[in-house]
Amino acid sequence: MNYRLFYAWSEFVEKIRQFFRSKGYLEVSTPILQSYPNADPHIEPLKVNLTLKGQTKSYWLHTSPEHAMKKLLAILPKDMFQITKVFRNGEYGRLHRPEFTMLEFYKIGTDYTGLIEDLKELLNLFGFEDFQILELEKAFEEYLGIVLSEEEEILKNNLMAYGYDFDDREDWETIFYRLYVELERCLASEKPTFLIKFPSKLAMYGVVKDGYAERFELYIKGIEIANGWTEERDPQKIRERMKEWVKDRDLPIDEELLQALPEIPEFSGCSVGLERLFMAVYNIESLDQIPWIFREEGL
């Protein structure tokens, strides 16, 4: 076991804390156990049954502190950040664990470009100085030779024209994410790359403007490090998205979050996988090399 990594991690996290404090962000803590689950697509929350006052009730371990922090922002509209453990069911591999450390931060009065600027400054502290910002459509054309379209039939026709194999029964999202995995392999350079302007179908909690989601993802050495967007504050739009996300899943919709959204001034938010960023900074190939990370056999 490389015990020096414990010291490196301590300094790494403290440097991040000091950076956000110096920028005027408030560090906050919110409960890991939540009454409502995060309803994100492709992420499965962990359910916990607790006995309280003689009655058993279901709670969820948060997959991110997003919902709780947004509820806090509704009553305390201030730039804020949190560093916390998060939990996701069914994730295990070189870059995935059911438990990991997340940095979540929110910035009032700015769109997602303000988050990118703060991330650039943060990355400067760890020796990253040269950055690339690339629109997702252009990335598909440059690296994969594919013209991306949100229309399923047009995308399939484009793939046939470029000689890509696919099952015609596959839907748009399945095809997109298969191609996206190929794109990730092309982003293996040392230069941090911000992919911006996502398809509106993939807006998540973000604003859609001029046909694109105001969303970005940060890649370093082919690893997704961060994910952020200009936050959508219209509860009806988010409700419709959440209904789609929880369809065929036994998950309730967080009504408290929907009530909070209109109370928040214009803002943007970002999540960062800290072990992954640590890997990029210290040239670590796998989460297996990080001694404190969750593993099947324990520490």
Task: Cite the ranges covered by each PLM segment.
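Hydrophobic face of alpha-helices
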Residues: 13, 17, 116-123, 239
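A translation/RNA-centric and nucleic-acid-associated enzymatic feature enriched
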Residues: 31-36, 43-71, 81-108, 151-299
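Acidic, low-complexity central loop/insert segments
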Residues: 108-142, 154
